[in-house]
Amino acid sequence: MSKTVTAQLPEIRDELAAFYKDLHRNPELSLQETRTAGLLSKRLREAGFDEVAEGIGVTGVVGVLRNGEGPVVMLRADFDALPVEEKTGLPYASQVRGVDHEGRDVPVMHACGHDMHAACLTGAAMLLARSRDQWRGTLLVVFQPAEELAVGARGMVDDGLFERFPEPEIVLGQHVGPLPAGVIGYGTGPVMAAADSLDLTLHGRGAHGSRPEASIDPVLMAANVVTRLQGIVAREVPPAETAVVTVGRLQAGTKDNIIPDKAELGINVRTFTPAIRDKVRDAIERIATAEAQASGAAEPPEFAWTGAAPALVSDPEATQATVAAFAEHFGQQRIMTMPQVNASEDVGVFGEVLGVPTVFWFWGGLDTETVLGALKEDRLDELPSNHSPHFAPVVEPTLSTGVEALVVAALTWLADA
């Protein structure tokens, strides 16, 4: 059945490629994706969806296609961009600038492939709408904003996504990455890490740089905390478990001869299980609190945890059924297993709040010959990957593979006509 549906892809391939390039040329930051949302909703209406709604979770788009009795299946794609200056040199490269959520003027680029995600889901929605004689059930298409801030999925849920629209029995999604174009990679169980961000403020007492004895130096406190945090993964997390603690930002003071009264650290945590997640978070707070006490700080540290996303769990049974359909459609030679990925995705929120399975897979966007050449020369780490200013998937076969994968996955769970 999937071959019958995807046989129509050549009829819309050029249109989709142009749409993808337009999205790439005109990226929008998280929760500012108004132009993109308007284009996506227009496409769904033109495809004949029964319901199309914008503004779900600020800028999210939802489409409902009812086609008789049968399962409710959800296809999801994100569509926000990043504050990155594009360096791909493509004729459709972004030259856009924007204002980020902290009020800074920044360059904007689709450096994570969300434009490809959105174009592929648009294509899959068009093909499934054209082929209603092939399946039965309800298709729920969700274009999610603000994945890069890890707040988009929760925002849509909190805005009544599953009260206003049919509750799906399964959630399906995908992510393009630095694999050979046309290849599909998958894992089962926890496939992407939980993410937590912490803004930590250490309070001290300021003084002139010539009189350190009059201070409680928050810079020294911060340095000790940064060093001590490295012991969490090395000495508190079991070797068989995976965790990452990264200090990506340390800010203190304005002048070399002034000891400031506070230091701020931006900390990122990645884990795969709730138990390790709690252990690492508790250890960070314990270490910072102990350092402040040891330094004689009058105020305890401030902890502001933000941007939390749960570990993404691809349901083992549902994933195996979907991958079997991929193998039948694409051929086993285009399917590969993947290790766990320490990056994070908030798509898991949807299935988690409903208690239904999520199936998530990856597909390649890099030129195959380029990947093989890098592999031969042991240069794989030099290839542009997600969030790189040089990352841009080759349009084909990336686009066609992404569209077909979504169609195949949806038809695996929708009822036969």
How would you describe each model-predicted region?
Residues 73, 142, 170-172, 357-361:
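Hydrophobic/aromatic beta-strand patches that form the interior of the parallel beta-sheet core
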Residues 12-19, 32-40, 71, 108, ...:
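General structural feature for long, well-ordered alpha-helical segments within catalytic domains
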Residues 74-76, 85, 198-200, 361-364:
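Non-cysteine beta-strand/loop elements that form the S-adenosyl-L-methionine
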Residues 2-110, 115, 119-123, 127-136:
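Acidic/His- and Gly-rich active-site-bordering loop/insert found
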Residues 61, 82-84, 89-109, 115-116, ...:
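Histidine/acidic-residue-rich, glycine-tolerant segments that coordinate divalent metal ions
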Residues 23, 63, 75, 114, ...:
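Divalent metal-coordination and catalytic microenvironments
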Residues 220-417:
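Metal-dependent amide/peptide-bond hydrolase catalytic core
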